[in-house]
């Protein structure tokens, strides 16, 4: 088990938390980051690119001139791809770029990302963070005290006050623990977890 310091919102140590080495202090595998982030970015692509082929371009139903005895090259339609205003030959069509990464790979990548933040001393665990009302200035002050600027804050989805407080901060974001992913961990410089959230991650990733 790895020991982690637990802080209050002013970064005063209030206790320690034992967490599984396999989840928070394992080996960092950067190739897993590549695989999972590539899949995530691929799934984010809209895939709506399209051009009109000759069947979609309006007009061109009539043969422009007779087949023979004109001295010109034979043509069947003014909307063929070699004509100005014609359809595009073999152009892009809408497609779905997403593909699945095995669940074991996704879990291993997430464990590796948590271990990376722990190794870099960019993982901060707080006892709890439950503001009474959304206050962006207060959230900024807390993150500054924790030394966690451009941070990803993770807690229960029900903590709406915290989510609204953090989302207006430039470079920082809030994620529900169920939605934690490798891409967002790597995209932020620091990771802030509550003690309960850390325990939930340990249980789900062990």
UniProtKB/Swiss-Prot annotation:
Keywords noted in UniProt: Ribonucleoprotein, Ribosomal protein, RNA-binding, rRNA-binding
Sequence ranges of Basic residues compositional bias: 63-72
Pfam families (UniProt xref): Ribosomal_L4
GO terms for biological process, alphabetical: translation
GO function terms (MF aspect): rRNA binding; structural constituent of ribosome
Domain of life of the organism encoding this protein: Bacteria
Region described as Disordered: spans on this chain: 48-97
Protein task: One of the primary rRNA binding proteins, this protein initially binds near the 5'-end of the 23S rRNA. It is important during the early stages of 50S assembly. It makes multiple contacts with different domains of the 23S rRNA in the assembled 50S subunit and ribosome.
Family label: Belongs to the universal ribosomal protein uL4 family.
Subunit structure: Part of the 50S ribosomal subunit.
Name of the protein described by the UniProt record: Large ribosomal subunit protein uL4
Annotated gene: rplD
């Amino acid at each position: 088990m790895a020991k982690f310091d637990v802080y209050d919102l002013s970064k005063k140590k209030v206790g320690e938390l034992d967490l599984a080495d396999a989840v928070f202090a394992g080996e960092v595998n950067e190739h897993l980051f590549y695989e999972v982030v590539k899949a995530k970015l691929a799934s984010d692509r809209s895939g709506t690119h399209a051009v009109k082929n000759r069947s979609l371009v309006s007009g061109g139903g009539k043969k422009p001139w007779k087949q023979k005895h004109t001295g010109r090259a034979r043509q069947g339609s003014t909307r063929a791809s070699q004509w100005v205003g014609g359809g595009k030959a073999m152009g892009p069509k809408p497609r779905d770029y997403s593909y699945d990464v095995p669940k074991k790979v996704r879990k291993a990548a997430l464990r590796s990302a948590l271990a990376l933040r722990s190794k870099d001393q960019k993982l901060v665990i707080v006892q709890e963070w439950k503001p009474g009302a959304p206050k962006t200035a207060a959230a900024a002050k807390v993150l500054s005290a924790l030394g966690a600027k451009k941070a990803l804050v993770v807690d229960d989805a029900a903590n709406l006050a915290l989510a609204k407080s953090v989302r207006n901060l430039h470079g920082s974001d809030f994620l529900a623990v169920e939605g934690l992913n490798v891409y967002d961990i790597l995209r932020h410089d620091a990771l802030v977890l509550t003690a309960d959230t850390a325990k939930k991650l340990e249980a789900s990733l062990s």
